[in-house]
A protein has these predicted regions:
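Active-site loop/lid in soluble adenylation, ligation, and acyl-transfer enzymes
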Residues: 2, 10-130, 245, 249-252
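Short histidine-centered catalytic/ligand-binding loop motif
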Residues: 46-56, 139-162
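Phosphate-binding core of ATP-grasp and ATP-grasp-like enzymes
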Residues: 119-136, 167-180, 203-208
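A long amphipathic alpha-helix within ATP-dependent nucleotide-binding catalytic cores
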Residues: 150-182
Length: 253
């Protein structure tokens, strides 16, 4: 377990650059530094832009939520946040899966099934997508997932159970923030002991968040849909989410 780390751990080379973060190696092979970017993308990077302070905001929100999840028994890759837009994380091998948990119909679920946007689901829906930009991150059946050997059947069961636990916690937390958790995406990885850890981030980039007190279908949006759908005020929405998270954490402490 990585408990205590030197505050001035040196950063080495760039390991990987994704759409939202850059990962750097450090002088500890089991620790990476994640640098959160202000870049914004949508529709598998077909739409690109920038959201002022997004890196700082998403890193701050993710850090708070990872700490809360750890305190509730969910193992994550989070270690600490040495700077507002940086997070030290445990090195994991990311499973090529995007795990989407849905509480309310929206986005592709509504488009593909005809369920009206806003339909509350009788129980949370857990979906697995193939994390592959070239293929457009397709929805997987359980048989296809196993056929492609993206994870073992046992790992899939563990991940699904973790996803439902995380959803239950986050749904309650966002509710305390006056925010409805419509759906969200998670990624998981394997550490050096082959243990499954929650990885990536939890932020308005990866969650569909609606202002609970707002009924207007456009004004209620507090997530990356504001960027996707050109609704404007993206920075204000992200900042508002951060403020509510910090206020809720402060109240709970």
């Amino acid at each position: 377990m990585l408990k205590s780390l030197p505050p001035t751990m040196s950063v080495h080379s760039k390991l990987y650059e994704g759409k939202a973060k850059i990962l750097y190696t450090t002088d500890n092979p089991e620790v990476l530094l994640a640098d959160f970017k202000d870049d914004a993308t949508a529709f598998n990077a077909q739409k690109r832009g920038s959201i002022l302070d997004k890196g700082r905001i998403n890193c701050s929100i993710s850090s708070q939520l990872f700490k809360k999840l750890e305190a509730n028994g969910i193992r994550t890759h989070f270690i600490d946040s040495p700077a507002p837009n940086q997070m030290r994380v445990k090195a994991v091998k990311i499973l090529p899966l995007e795990v989407v948990i849905r509480n309310i119909a929206a986005g592709s679920l509504s488009q593909q099934t005809g369920l009206p946007v806003g339909t509350v689901l009788k129980q949370p829906l857990v979906e697995f997508y193939y994390k592959n930009d070239q293929l457009g991150d397709p929805l997987l059946t359980s048989d296809r997932l196993l056929l492609l050997e993206l994870a073992t059947a046992e790992q899939v069961d563990v991940i699904k159970n973790l996803a439902l636990q995380i959803n239950e916690f986050l749904r309650r937390f966002w509710q305390q923030c006056g925010i409805t958790l419509v759906d969200f995406k998670l990624e998981f990885g394997l550490d050096s002991q082959q243990q499954i850890l929650l990885a990536d981030e939890i932020s308005p980039d990866t969650c569909r968040l609606w202002d609970t007190a707002e009924t207007d279908p456009n004004r209620r949006v507090m997530d990356k849909d504001r960027f996707r759908r050109d609704l404007g005020n993206v920075e204000d929405a992200y900042q508002e989410v951060l403020q509510r998270v910090l206020q809720t954490v402060d109240t709970q402490n």
